[in-house]
Amino acid sequence: SQISLRGSNLTI
């Protein structure tokens, strides 16, 4: 899944 954190994209 992809999570948006402070404008950064984290793909986990």
UniProtKB/Swiss-Prot annotation:
Superkingdom to which the source organism belongs: Eukaryota
Main location: secreted
GO cellular component, one term: extracellular region
GO terms (BP aspect): proteolysis
Glycan-carrying positions: 9
Record's subcellular location: Secreted, Extracellular space
Known EC number: 3.4.23.-
GO molecular function term, any single one: aspartic-type endopeptidase activity
Keywords per UniProt: Aspartyl protease, Glycoprotein, Hydrolase, Protease, Secreted
Free-text tissue specificity from the UniProt record: Chorionic epithelium (trophectoderm) and placental cotyledons.
Family assignment from sequence similarity: Belongs to the peptidase A1 family.
Note: On the 2D-gel the determined pI of this protein is: 5.7, its MW is: 50 kDa.
Entry protein name: Pregnancy-associated glycoprotein 50C
Taxonomic lineage from the root: Eukaryota, Metazoa, Chordata, Craniata, Vertebrata
